[in-house]
C-alpha cells in the first residue's frame, strides 16, 4: 500500500505514537470528530493528543491489531478508513473510523472523523 498522510495517521494512532502523530499534524490543525455520544473538536496538537489518548483510546484501551487501512483521493481531499481490534476491561471490540483530511506544508491541517464506536466483533 502506498503511504499517505491518512494511512500514516492511522498507523501512528494504532501504535499510540503521540510523537509521530505530532509530526503528521499541522500546528494549526482544524479537527472535528463525531462518536456515538458526542462531537469533538481540537485546534492544536495538544488538544488533539488529549482527545485521542484521554478520551477515544485511553490507557485502558489496548489496540491489539490493525484490521484494515484504506485511503483514496476525493478531489482535493484524502479519505482514509481504518479498523482496529481493541481490548479493554470490558472485552474485545472493533473500532472503525472514516476520516477526510487536507494537507498543508506536508502535514494534516484539516480533518473530519466519524467513529463507529466500540463494537463487539
Can you name each region flagged by the protein language model?
Residues 1, 5, 48, 93:
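Soluble or luminal CAZymes and related metallo-dependent hydrolases
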Residues 1-28:
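Short, low-complexity N-terminal intrinsically disordered segments enriched in polar/charged residues
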Residues 12, 32, 86-87:
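Alpha-helix C-capping/helix-to-loop hinge sites
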Residues 18-20, 26-73:
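A solvent-exposed, acidic/Ser-Thr-rich amphipathic alpha-helical stretch
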Residues 3-13, 36-39, 53-57, 110:
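Short, mixed-charge, low-aromatic patches
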Residues 50-121:
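A beta-strand edge to alpha-helix "cap/lid" segment located at domain peripheries
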Amino acid at each position: 500500500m502506498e503511504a499517505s498522510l491518512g494511512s500514516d495517521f492511522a498507523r501512528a494512532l494504532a501504535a499510540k505514537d503521540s510523537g509521530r502523530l505530532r509530526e503528521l499534524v499541522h500546528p494549526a490543525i482544524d479537527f472535528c470528530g463525531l462518536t456515538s455520544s458526542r462531537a469533538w473538536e481540537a485546534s492544536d496538537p495538544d488538544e488533539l493528543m488529549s482527545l485521542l489518548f484521554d478520551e477515544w483510546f485511553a490507557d485502558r484501551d489496548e489496540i491489539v491489531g490493525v484490521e484494515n487501512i484504506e485511503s483514496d483521493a476525493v478531489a482535493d481531499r484524502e479519505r482514509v478508513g481504518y479498523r482496529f481490534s481493541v481490548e479493554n476491561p470490558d472485552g474485545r471490540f472493533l473500532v472503525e473510523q472514516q476520516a477526510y483530511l487536507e494537507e498543508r506544508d506536508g502535514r494534516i491541517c484539516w480533518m473530519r472523523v466519524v467513529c463507529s464506536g466500540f463494537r463487539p466483533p
